[in-house]
């Protein structure tokens, strides 16, 4: 239970790993509709997705697309049928065009052209959710706000080497390699550019966006001003983990994914001018300490 402007809010977290009354298969339409009808929520924060890192996406675009279409359609239908007028829906910077007309990309460019081929399933499902939110906002006057984070990292991440994102995948692998004395390998050339966002910072932005009623139906890119080559991210990790960076081997036979997907945070800074982002080196330190 949290308090905001003298209002008390109780948050219920749906988690498929916890077997309780709040365990719901979001791909099951009837289960989702029944659950929402039972609990009568006032707001929603829609974080759920079938999601993973580059190599999960490359190998599973079809099922990822199908699962996310079902999840998003079911959740949105349940919201509308049960009178939920306001909520936060999470997109991702990876849904932006692979070859945009300009950098940095802003919120108006999401549907400008095709996403990177490695991420088509997830990207198109999220783009469709974005369109659904916009259509509901127009026709039913809902206040469905779409937030667009860049690469997230932090405690409680998915560190499974089979389907994790960039930082948790590297951290897990380097930690194990250091313990066993095995060679440390990073995938690709290290040249792609990435913007990073500490997960706890994003959680604060979600909370503020939900309860700041001046924010109505916007799509908001969420990030700070920092951008790194992947090799620089690896260097930060090695410093944090007390590893000699010169020992890192780069497997350039592995895909780099999208080389650049820089997005514009102007609207974020306008809406949250006093927000203090966690510096990358501190976020990495906190993540490794938790791990």
Model features per residue range: what roles?
Residues 28, 43, 67-74, 86, ...:
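Conserved cofactor-binding/catalytic machinery of classical short-chain dehydrogenase/reductase
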Residues 73-119, 145:
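Conserved Rossmann-fold NAD(P)-dependent oxidoreductase catalytic core, especially the SDR/UDP-sugar
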Residues 121, 125-128:
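Active-site helix of classical SDR
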Residues 14, 44-50, 87-93, 147-149:
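SDR active-site strand-loop-helix element
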Residues 99-108, 131-208, 235-241:
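NAD(P)-dependent short-chain dehydrogenase/reductase
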Residues 2, 6-32:
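Adenosine-cofactor binding site in Rossmann-like domains, unifying the SAM/SAH pocket
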Residues 176-291:
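C-terminal substrate-binding subdomain of Rossmann-fold SDR/epimerase-dehydratase oxidoreductases
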Residues 26-68, 81:
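NAD(P)H-binding glycine-rich loop region in Rossmannoid oxidoreductase-like domains
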